[in-house]
Amino acid sequence: LNKGKCTEILACYEPAFRFMAEWWKQLYGESEGKNGIGIFPASLEYTADLHSMGQYVQDGPRKLYETVVSFEKSLTSFAVPFGMGDPDGLNYLAGRDLHDICRTARDAVKAAHISGGVPNIGVSVDKRDEAGYAELVCFFELACAISGYMSGVNPFDQPGVEAYKKNMFKMLGKPGA
């Protein structure tokens, strides 16, 4: 099923996606991490993590694969301004839309990671709005249930969580614990 991969990285080029990625890690960690098996869920926020973690993904051990979430349409528009004297060396981007620049970064990183041997799955939704997030929740919950059953675990229980909660409640003196 996982072809020797033990880590799935969920990546997105949208900072506002951070908390959705945290939800995704909880969903997959609680649902699949059982009986000594399961793929470790991790997340990266590109482009912020590209220079640090991008190096690891590109040239590190080949025990991971990447799922990249993309929003095809931006909710806002921002054109890169022209800087007098080109102080940051970015005038070649002047007038270009930030969403288009991020899309180009996504495509360039995907090509590099694939050529470097990192399997890459793309998940695309129209916009980062309520409907887009609802599509992602439905997709990931269904995918998680299917992959859990295919791995031979019940994706709907959490015995590991119950074990630490039981210990914590007892240590804190919760009545009946």
Which residues does each predicted region cover?
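A SIS-like phosphosugar-recognition module
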Residues: 1-177
